[in-house]
């Protein structure tokens, strides 16, 4: 297997774009080669098979949507409060809007995981770990709310992102409403 990290990242980024635009059925090693504009067979030099490619796509999407450490440090320099939670929720949503193909690819991976039990188990492990990381981050930062509040925020933001990606008209009547602020106010008390 080839080990050029820049080429691997470029292939994974191309794979994310293919998965987002063509769906799981359109994701082939050859399609990734075409999207990455590399010679046919390049992708197969980096990934043994489609299953390995799918798992590495999951890892790459996580890298792409994770905030830069400097940005996160700036955000977290504020006092723990409901307002800080709202800011963090907005930033998650902004990252989704800035990298829509990454989120669409994650949705496609989730759907593929329902059809392929081995992949589904691996994705379940990854997403469970990510949720636990989010809970731990929230609690360690002293933000208001408990573990269940964090899970509810996680579910609400994922639902909002899903609608924004797939049926943006659903939330159109609420454009003037700050849904993130409403979420935080209804779920989190300042003294929790």
Each model region followed by its residue ranges:
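Short alpha-helical scaffolding segments that buttress acidic/His motifs in well-ordered protein cores
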Residues: 92, 106, 110, 153-160
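Amphipathic alpha-helical packing segments from all-alpha helical-bundle domains
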Residues: 66-67, 97-107, 114-141, 148-151, ...
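Hydrophobic/aromatic-rich alpha-helical bundle segments in the mid-to-C-terminal region
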Residues: 119-120, 124, 138-192
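Short, basic, alpha-helical segments at the C-terminal edge of helix-turn-helix-like DNA-binding modules
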Residues: 59-66
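N-terminal intrinsically disordered/low-complexity leader segments
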Residues: 1-6, 191-192
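Hydrophobic alpha-helical connector segments
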Residues: 56, 69-102, 153, 177
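Helix-turn-helix
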Residues: 10, 14-56
